[in-house]
């Protein structure tokens, strides 16, 4: 998993609340069990005018040329609600997004994102609105998300602080998923197992 320390990238926004996982990645695309290949289906029902995904919707934000290559998504409250499918953060990450900034997230989506290297940043509704206004007013607007300082810097230089549980921050800073985190304690695990009596094995 790629470590997340500090990232500066083009920002895009979907100014809607309660964006659920069915909208992020519709159910018909969930047959794969590997993490790659989902980006093309991200927000399928909004991005395309046809079921086959061959006719882009020119009015959808992510299809606008000015947001091509965006790596930071702004959204409103309760992002990632709905079913618990882990494919949602897979699709967002495969599309090229590194961070999602919103006033609140659904709990399961929030945890799944951290476990898959996608940083969910909680800011106040007013702070998110300011970021959206700045992004909308200037083409090519970039936002910096710094996990080492837990600060977000807006396109015009305003700084906003955010919090993240230290365990989650440690995993993201070091690029550790659940397996990687376990392996990082390999020495301690080995020492513990060496002390277990053979009759208990």
UniProtKB/Swiss-Prot annotation:
The keyword Disulfide bond does not apply. GO terms for cellular component: 3-isopropylmalate dehydratase complex. InterPro entries: 3-IsopropMal_deHydase_ssu, Aconitase/3IPM_dehydase_swvl, AconitaseA/IPMdHydase_ssu_swvl, IPMI_Swivel, LeuD. The keyword Lyase applies. Pfam families: Aconitase_C (PF00694). Keywords: Amino-acid biosynthesis, Branched-chain amino acid biosynthesis, Leucine biosynthesis, Lyase. CDD domains: IPMI_Swivel (cd01577). GO terms for biological process: L-leucine biosynthetic process. Heterodimer of LeuC and LeuD. Belongs to the LeuD family. LeuD type 1 subfamily. This is 3-isopropylmalate dehydratase small subunit. It comes from Shewanella sp. (strain ANA-3).
